[in-house]
Design a protein with these regions (language model features):
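N-terminal secretory signal peptides
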Residues: 1-9, 20
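Cleavable N-terminal signal peptides
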Residues: 20-21, 31
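Charged catalytic cores and adjacent phosphate/nucleic-acid-binding surfaces used
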Residues: 34-40, 198-292
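A metal-dependent hydrolase metal-coordination microenvironment
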Residues: 40-163, 253-256
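Divalent metal-coordination and catalytic microenvironments
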Residues: 47, 130, 186, 221, ...
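A general structural detector for well-ordered alpha-helical segments in enzyme core domains, enriched
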Residues: 57-61, 91-98, 118, 171, ...
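Domain-core and long-helix interface of multi-subunit machines
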Residues: 134-144, 148-241
Length: 292
C-alpha cells in the first residue's frame, strides 16, 4: 500500500495549481469586486477551509477583502483523509465553540453518505449551514472513489462516458434528496477525460434533473471561483428555473475570499439579493427541516 503522503492528494492539492494559476491574473479584479457597490447583496464566501490555518489569521483577511466567510471543515468518518475531519459530537461542538463570537458562519463540508451517523441532530443544529459535493462517487465495487485522484476513472468504469454521466446525475439527485444539506458545491465538475466536452455531457435534460431536485429540497448551488463552474449555460438554466446560488472559493489561507469569477458570473446573470442563499435562522436550515 502506498504511503499516506502518496495516496492522500486531497481537493486542496488538486486545486492548488488552479488557484495559483488564477491568482495573479484575477487578483486586481477580485480586490475591486469585493468592495464593489454595484451589487445589492453582501459578498459572502461560503466555502472556506481553515485546514492548518487559524481563525485568528483568517478573520483579518475577511475584513481586508470585504467578504464574510463561511468556514467549513470536512465532517464524516475517519476514513476520509483531510487535514481536519470532524467525526463525532465532541469534535463538532469544539469546532463550533472555537468559531463562536467570530464574524463568520459556522458550517461543515459533509463527506460521503455515512456522515449523518457521526452526529446527533442537536449537534448539527449548532451549525449555520451544511455543504457537500458529488466528487466522491461509488466505484464499481461500491466503495467511495475520489474522482479527482489518479486511477479513479478505471475504478468507476468510465469507458462508457454516457452511461457514467447518467449515473453521475443520479448521484447528484441522491445526495440532494437524501442528505440534510443547504449547499451543493463544485457543481457540474467532470473527470478530466470528460471536462473538455462539458456541453456534450451536461445536456439541458441532465441539468434540469439536478435543478428540479435542488428546487424540491431547497438546496442552493455554488458558483465556484476555483473551478469556474458551473459553466454559463448551466447557470442561465438554473437562474431561469429559480434555483438559488451561493459564492464559494474552496480557499485555504491566504486564498479564501477570492471570488472574482463568481462575482463576474453574478453580474452576467444579473443576480440580486433574492437569488442568493444566505444562512437562515434556526428552523429554516436543512438540519432542522429535513428528515434523516
Amino acid at each position: 500500500m502506498a504511503s499516506p503522503a502518496k495516496r492522500a492528494m486531497t481537493r486542496r492539492g488538486f486545486l492548488r495549481g488552479t488557484v495559483a494559476a488564477g491568482c495573479l491574473i484575477l487578483a486586481p479584479r477580485r480586490s475591486h469586486a469585493a468592495g464593489s457597490t454595484d451589487l445589492d447583496f453582501p459578498i459572502e464566501d461560503l466555502h472556506v477551509h481553515l485546514d492548518n490555518s487559524t481563525i485568528d489569521k483568517v478573520v483579518p483577511l475577511a475584513k481586508e477583502r470585504g467578504v464574510k466567510f463561511g468556514i467549513v471543515e470536512h465532517a464524516g468518518t475517519k476514513e476520509n483523509q483531510y487535514p481536519i475531519v470532524l467525526s463525532n459530537d465532541a469534535e463538532l461542538k469544539a469546532y463550533v465553540a472555537m468559531l463562536e463570537g467570530q464574524p463568520v458562519y459556522k458550517g461543515i463540508q459533509a463527506e460521503w453518505t455515512d456522515w449523518m451517523g457521526c452526529f446527533s441532530r442537536d449537534a448539527l443544529a449548532q451549525l449555520d449551514f451544511i455543504l457537500t459535493d458529488t466528487m466522491t462517487f461509488p466505484g464499481k465495487d461500491g466503495q467511495r472513489v475520489k474522482l479527482w485522484l489518479e486511477g479513479a476513472e478505471a475504478k468507476v468504469g468510465l469507458t462508457d462516458k454516457e452511461a457514467f454521466m447518467d449515473r453521475y446525475v443520479d448521484w447528484h439527485i441522491e445526495i440532494i434528496s437524501r442528505q440534510p444539506i443547504d449547499l451543493l458545491a463544485n457543481v457540474s465538475w467532470l473527470p478530466g477525460s470528460m471536462a473538455g466536452e462539458y456541453e456534450k455531457f451536461w445536456t439541458e435534460a441532465r441539468v434540469k434533473r439536478v435543478l428540479d431536485a435542488a428546487l424540491k429540497f431547497g438546496v442552493a448551488l455554488e458558483i465556484s471561483a476555483s473551478f469556474k463552474l458551473p459553466r454559463l449555460s448551466f447557470l442561465r438554466q438554473a437562474k431561469a428555473a429559480g434555483v438559488r446560488f451561493c459564492l464559494g472559493s474552496n480557499g485555504r489561507y491566504p486564498n479564501m475570499g477570492q471570488l472574482g469569477w463568481s462575482l463576474e458570473m453574478a453580474r452576467t446573470l444579473g443576480l440580486n439579493k433574492s437569488d442568493l442563499y444566505t444562512p437562515g435562522p434556526p428552523g429554516l436550515r436543512a438540519a432542522d427541516r429535513r428528515k434523516f
